[in-house]
Swiss-Prot record:
GO term, biological process aspect, one: proteolysis
Name of the protein: Secreted aspartic protease 7
Taxonomic placement: Eukaryota, Fungi, Dikarya, Ascomycota, Saccharomycotina
Entry keyword set: Aspartyl protease, Cleavage on pair of basic residues, Disulfide bond, Glycoprotein, Hydrolase, Protease, Secreted, Signal, Virulence, Zymogen
Major localization class: secreted
Protein family (similarity comment): Belongs to the peptidase A1 family.
Gene: SAP7
One GO location term (cellular component): fungal-type cell wall
Amino acid sequence: MQRVLELLLLSSTALAVIGDGFIALPVHKLQAGEGSAHFPNRLPIFDVVNGVAKSVEDDVNQIIQPIFGNGIFSGGSIQGTHSGNGHSVKYEVSLPSSSAQKGSNGPSSTDNKDTDPSKTGFSLDDLMNSISTDFWNLIGLNKPPTSSDNGSKDADFTPSAVSQVEQPTSKSVESTAPGSASSASSSSSSEAASSSQPSEDSQPSSSANKKTGAFFLSLDNTQTLYTATLKVGSPAQEVQVMIDTGSSDLWFISSGNSQCKVNGGSIDCDKYGVFDKSKSSSWHDNKTDYSISYYDGDKASGTMGQDNITFADGFSIENANFAVIDNTTSSIGVFGVGYPELEAVKSKYTNLPFAMKEQNLIAKVAYSLYLDSRDAVQGYILFGGIDHAFYTGDLKAFDIVQCNDKYVYSQIPLTSVASSLNNYTNAYGLPAGSNHPKVGAVIYNGTDSFNGGVDLKDTLTLLDTGTTYSYLSKDQVESIVGLYGNVTYNDAGKAYEVPCWVGNPGNYLEFNFKNEQYIKVPTSEFVISVGTYASGAELCVFGILPGTHSILGDNFMRSVYAVFDLEDHVISIAQAAYNDNHAVVPIE
């Protein structure tokens, strides 16, 4: 088996022991312009009134098939052919003799929940033990623990299979799962990557070939928003959309959008791609009008319909509901992953997160977000799973707060914000008229401690990837800015001025959630250079803006690992850990 796995590794197929198949797709970031007023805020404008063991055969099939394809169990060996990345490898893997002796026909084909090896032919532990530790070390993975290792795992997030990934890495992470008081080491290390993608004219897989478990969607960092690439229609058309936890609809810009340059408008619609429904044989127009307005001023109108959407090979939604927009000034569509209550149509429908569970792509309507650092090229949204390598400390769960007895926004209470200043380079000797630091307010002689802060009184706050900056009430923003000196509003930037040195490395804001979780965010995320004073000194404004809704946008979200569970109505958060390792566990 070791030699076969090495051959597969050489053919650019990597392995990871995790849930029943998961895929990684990248998220891209847009480039920021100057100032702050024109960045995306895709919060829709609405008046809101209104752990069971499987049979050994199942376990082994889940592990073998993603690696080798559909092999045949025959006596004490597994035979078959694996194809991928332009390579085809025939294999015959001999099972350990102790296993082969137990049954001439391999594992039982019945749905036997008893995993006793003496009753099922051979055990999953036998298979895992047959792979040498040297091989796991070779590909950069820790050898997965077996029952004989007395290893523990979180009962809420149970790994169940192996999947193909691109970049083998390893990390063992101590973690506490949402809703669980016990801390456990993740029993499966995995690699985030993108599985081989279907060709442009490939058809979405039938439900019989779909995988269940967890899958990544890569998010490309454009500096103002995060974009994901989806394949829609038959044959597939590749279109980028921005990922948005603050809305619920998926919509694509139509090739017929009147605002596109090719149609006489001013928008470069080719930059992120458009959907031409006339070229899709599987498109169905349901004749329902669609219209939505966002707080950043963008609007979109078109019609609702259904078509097939592919995220990665084996992970697709058939007859997904979405809108095709023929009139918008936005250059990119939106992939809303919020509650259905935020849908911009009167008759509610099954949006994509819920359709993923309905069509068995994931076991629970949940996803986790890791945007990585500000300078990172991409982040990830992981549907149906948690990557324990992407955070430090414990995940703390907070109940999502309802709005008028309905789950509408993914909002949790924000208790307070404090500041720590440890780097005073260029803090003094500022020109007259500039925003001098208020000595004694938050300057603690270089110590990493807090003598104060701003009490936000558990303000309900939306965690929103569709918003570039963050928003609090005018009074709250002024209180935070007041920690740094004079409170001056800049009309041109539509934001409050702040001393540029506050953004020095080593300075940070600490966000307190119910005195249970504290997230540190570098102040550089909130200090935005927008020009110069008349004196020539640099002018900066604060990246928490005054608004009617409390929103923690991308400049906060990059510092947190967040798990959105729309089924149990909780959001779990922890301090983000920037690295390239993975330890993925599907949520069951």
